[in-house]
Curated annotation (Swiss-Prot):
It comes from Brassica napus (Rape). Keywords: Oxidoreductase, Phosphoprotein. Pfam families: PMSR (PF01625). InterPro entries: Met_Sox_Rdtase_MsrA_dom, Met_Sox_Rdtase_MsrA_sf, MsrA_MetSO_reductase. This is Peptide methionine sulfoxide reductase. It is an enzyme of class 1 (oxidoreductase). Belongs to the MsrA Met sulfoxide reductase family. Residues 61-88 are annotated as: Disordered. The gene is PMSR. Its EC number is 1.8.4.11. GO terms for molecular function: L-methionine:thioredoxin-disulfide S-oxidoreductase activity; peptide-methionine (S)-S-oxide reductase activity. The keyword Protein biosynthesis does not apply. Has an important function as a repair enzyme for proteins that have been inactivated by oxidation. Catalyzes the reversible oxidation-reduction of methionine sulfoxide in proteins to methionine.
Length: 257
C-alpha cells in the first residue's frame, strides 16, 4: 500500500499577513544586532584587586628584603647624616634591636647614659609618622638614640647591652614583632664606633650557632618618634604599669603595648 506523507507547508513572508510580516522583520533585525560585550577580557577577573606595597606578604613576614627607595619619592634629607648635636662632652649612638620601647628602657638603666630618645632612621621618606613606618613602605627602622658620657660608660658596654637585648640572628623579626622596622642594626657616628661594632660582632658570631644578620651602617637622619612613644615603658605604657628606669636596675623588661 502506498502511503503519502505530506510535507509541512513552507511559510514565507509573502504568505503572512502584513502585521505578521512586520513582526517577523523586527525579530530578524534584533537577531542581527551585535551582542553586548563585557568591558573585561575573558581571561581577566571582573573584580579589581588593589595591591599595595604594604601588603607584600613575604616582606611583612620577615622573609623579604627591606623596601627599596623610589627615586621619585626618596628624600636626600632622610638618607643624609644625623645633623643633631649631642651635649658638650657627650656622644651619640643609634641601635635597632626590635621594638624601641624595650630597647630604650634597657639603655635608660645604663650608668653613664644621659639621654635616650626613640625614633625612626635609615629610611628614605622625610618626616615619617609611626603609621607610615608601620606600613613597611618607608624603609625606616625603630631606633633608640643613646646619648652617653664616654668618660663614664664605654661604647663597648653599650654594645653588650645591644647583644643581650635581642636576637641578632633573626631577619626582620624579634619574637612576635615582625617586619623590616624591627631589624637588627648598629648605626655609628665615628670610625671608632664602627671598628668596635664590627669587632664585637665577630666575637658574638663565634658564640652563636646561627649567622648574625645585624647591619652596621653610618648613622643617618634621626626622626624623633611621637611623644607618647618616649620612655613608654617607664611611664607605664597602655597598661599603666611603670617599669623602673633606675640606673643599674636588672628587673626583667616586659615589652607590652
Amino acid at each position: 500500500m502506498l502511503s503519502i506523507v505530506a510535507s509541512p507547508p513552507v511559510i514565507s513572508a509573502v504568505s503572512l499577513s502584513k502585521p505578521l510580516q512586520s513582526l517577523a522583520k523586527a525579530a530578524l533585525s534584533l537577531s542581527k544586532r551585535a551582542k553586548p560585550t563585557s568591558p573585561f577580557p575573558k581571561t581577566a577577573r571582573s573584580i579589581s584587586v588593589y595591591k599595595s606595597p604594604m601588603n607584600n606578604l613575604f616582606t611583612r613576614l620577615g622573609f623579604g628584603s627591606r623596601p627599596q627607595p623610589d627615586p621619585a619619592a626618596s628624600s636626600a634629607i632622610a638618607q643624609g647624616p644625623d645633623d643633631d648635636v649631642p651635649s658638650p662632652g657627650q656622644q651619640f649612638a643609634q641601635f635597632g634591636a626590635g621594638c624601641f620601647w624595650g630597647a630604650e628602657l634597657a639603655y635608660q638603666r645604663v650608668p653613664g647614659v644621659t639621654k635616650t630618645e626613640v625614633g625612626y632612621s635609615h629610611g628614605f621618606v622625610d618626616n615619617p609618622t609611626y603609621e607610615d613606618v608601620c606600613s613597611e613602605t618607608t624603609g625606616h627602622n625603630e631606633i633608640v638614640r643613646v646619648q652617653y658620657d664616654p668618660k663614664e660608660v664605654s661604647f663597648e658596654s653599650l654594645l653588650d647591652v645591644f647583644w643581650k637585648r635581642h636576637d641578632p640572628t633573626t631577619l626582620n623579626r624579634q619574637g612576635n614583632d615582625v617586619g623590616t622596622r624591627y631589624r637588627s642594626g648598629i648605626y655609628f657616628y665615628t670610625d671608632e664606633q664602627e671598628k668596635l661594632a664590627r669587632e664585637a660582632m665577630e666575637k658574638q658570631q663565634k658564640i652563636l650557632n646561627r649567622k648574625i644578620v645585624t647591619e652596621i651602617l653610618p648613622a643617618t637622619k634621626f626622626y624623633r618618634a611621637e611623644n607618647y612613644h618616649q620612655q613608654y615603658l617607664a611611664k607605664g605604657g597602655r597598661m599603666g604599669l611603670s617599669q623602673s628606669a633606675e640606673k643599674g636596675c636588672n628587673d626583667p623588661i616586659r615589652c607590652y603595648g
